Amino acid sequence: MDKVMAQLEGLVAHYEELQEMMADPEVINDTKRYMEISKEEADMREVVQKYRKYKSDIKEIDDNKEIISSESDDDLVEMAKEENSELEKEVAKLEDEIKILMLPKDPNDDKDIIMEIRGAAGGDEASLFAGDLLRMYEKYAETQGWKVSLIDSEPTEVGGYKRVAVMITGDKVYSKLKYENGAHRVQRVPVTESQGRVHTSTATVAVMPEYEQVDIDLDPKDIRVDVYRSSGAGGQHINKTSSAVRMTHLPTGIVVAMQDQRSQQQNREKAMQILKSRVYDYYESQNRDKYDAKRKDAVGTGDRSERIRTYNYPQNRVTDHRIGLTLNKLDRVMNGELDEIINALVLYYQTQQLEKMAEENA
């Protein structure tokens, strides 16, 4: 904890500098700079407040120890001991909270995401489950105040998706949904099953952060652009014109379709932004082999034996295999109630980081 405390002293000094800057008329008049500084100040506020409370409690404990060692009044000594008992519990709690707040932040946590869901092993049933997962994430996004926009989809005749990609925008989307990367297994009786037998199918989920601005130039010759009539929201007007846009990056085969915006030009701009983000993510791994290996690590091959989570419909049970968490409320989870699972995953990975930090500081 000593190393963490040394870092905190520097952090508090920087926090106080930020507060002074926010009161500077020159900064106040520069909206962009003021917003950047105020966001940094807000991000640091909780840990600074907890550290100040921690220091205040430590001082009170020391003062009480002095009373205990020097005071002759038994009642005062007893009162000081009782206070210290409570303060020591509070200090231990604050230490744990501060350690978590001081863990290295994932630089992508504040970013929006591109989520790709694919029906994998299991044929039609896998594609139906891919659609169920999409609806689950859409409902969860609604509870968080996030927006979901369709990028591209490959629907199946039975009503599911062979593949569907969406963009989810809002506050700290990646920080919560990054744990959804992987193979999701479903066990249920398909609607086409006449014997009532339970089948096992799989869908894979890939979650990629959306980069607002990426340092990549795409050769226009490498991009095929198709326009078509939108079938989504927007009223009659949007269906009368070919406002929807599909862009294909020919060297990588990456496809982005956008129809959420009001005009073709807006759809083009948004599609290009997303395409750049996805192509950038692709080339980050230098070549296709590394990209495929990275994606396989993230989502698995889709084989039934690989999974991060199992959704068992007959028993209304969902199990996250990474942390051994089982909940007997699958119906509520599929209705978007994901917080209990996501919070448990966050705690699990925070605990792992804390253990690593303790080893490094030992």
Swiss-Prot record:
Cited function: Peptide chain release factor 1 directs the termination of translation in response to the peptide chain termination codons UAG and UAA.
Task: Return the similarity comment.
Answer: Belongs to the prokaryotic/mitochondrial release factor family.
Q: Give a short account of its post-translational modification.
A: Methylated by PrmC. Methylation increases the termination efficiency of RF1.
Q: Which GO terms describe its molecular function?
A: translation release factor activity, codon specific
Listed PANTHER family: LD18447P
Q: Which domain of life is it from?
A: Bacteria
Q: What is this protein called?
A: Peptide chain release factor 1
GO terms under cellular component: cytoplasm
> Subcellular location, in the record's words?
Cytoplasm
Q: Keyword Protein biosynthesis: yes or no?
A: yes
Identify residues that carry N5-methylglutamine.
236
Pfam families per the UniProt record, alphabetical = PCRF (PF03462), RF-1 (PF00472)
Q: Which UniProt keywords apply?
A: Cytoplasm, Methylation, Protein biosynthesis
Q: Write down the species.
A: Lactobacillus gasseri (strain ATCC 33323 / DSM 20243 / BCRC 14619 / CIP 102991 / JCM 1131 / KCTC 3163 / NCIMB 11718 / NCTC 13722 / AM63)
> What InterPro entries does this protein's entry cite?
PCRF, Pep_chain_release_fac_I, Pep_chain_release_fac_I_sf, Prokaryotic/Mito_RF, RF-1
